[in-house]
Regions:
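Hydrophobic alpha-helical bundle segments that form small-molecule/ligand-binding pockets
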Residues: 130-186, 232-234
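Key DNA-contact positions within bacterial/archaeal DNA-binding proteins
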Residues: 48, 59-60
Length: 243
């Protein structure tokens, strides 16, 4: 198969014969691509940047990994490769908690990976492995035919929080309201008791980086716990219906 050419018009300089680094490996390509993704987002860097970092040609990268879409998939897979499958000895709730807390730790280090997973589903080897293990845990717990829905609800509810934060920190050229702007808007009409509670929460998100990150982690865990509360209630109903 012939590699498609990068989106670049040939020039006299580019047509001159030059020596490229052809001895690189797929692992080296992904290491550089992951580094670019952590800095610019999974979709925020160009092939030209990657080729410049590697000092190689697109045909070499294409042969080793594939096109730009394949590179994105491989980067996301590499980003979540450290997420381990929890012990089967844990009950389903502990199992999902352990998995999804690990998932957050991995995804926040690679902006754009959360959105990629939400849009592409289990399109990488590691995401499929984790999903299959999750379905096994939920099936064993008694969710039966609803195991896939239960896993999807837990995964998407939490991963969306990461994707929302990524949307604010990855430059897109489009205006994106930050929490400071939200806080200003909420305060315009003067506080009331319910609204002041929301102001306090948004104020933490809008605080210094360490405070904001701690708040995001706490909010993620709160969301996860409440989703699992709902799934636990549903599991009780499923078991009751089988009596």
């Amino acid at each position: 198969m012939t590699a498609p050419s990068p989106d670049k018009k040939p020039t006299a300089t580019s047509q001159r014969r030059r020596s490229y680094n052809t001895g690189i490996t797929a692992d080296a390509v992904l290491t550089v691509a992951l580094g670019l993704s952590r800095e610019h987002g999974v979709e925020g860097w160009s092939l030209r940047q990657l080729l410049g970092e590697l000092d190689t040609s697109f045909s070499v990268v294409y042969r080793l990994v594939g096109d730009r879409d394949a590179l994105s998939a491989a980067v996301v897979d590499r980003a979540i490769s450290a997420v381990s499958v929890p012990s089967a000895e844990r009950d389903w709730r502990q199992w999902l908690t352990h998995l999804l807390v690990q998932m957050r730790e991995a995804l926040v280090e690679c902006p754009g990976a959360a959105q990629w997973l939400l849009m592409n589903g289990v399109a990488t080897e590691r995401s499929r492995e984790l999903m299959e293990a999750g379905l096994a845990s939920l099936t064993d717990a008694g969710f039966g035919a609803e195991a896939a829905q239960a896993y999807t609800v837990a995964f998407t509810s939490t991963t969306t929080l990461i994707a929302m934060h990524d949307a604010r920190r990855i430059p897109s050229g489009e205006p994106s309201p930050d929490h400071g702007a939200m806080l200003d808007q909420l305060s315009k009409d003067g506080p009331t008791d319910p609204r002041s509670s929301m102001e306090a929460l948004i104020g933490k998100f809008a605080g210094p980086p360490d405070t904001a990150e701690a708040t995001r982690a706490e909010h993620y865990r709160y969301t996860l716990d409440r989703v699992l509360d709902g799934l636990e209630a549903r599991l009780d109903a499923i078991k009751e219906s089988r009596k």
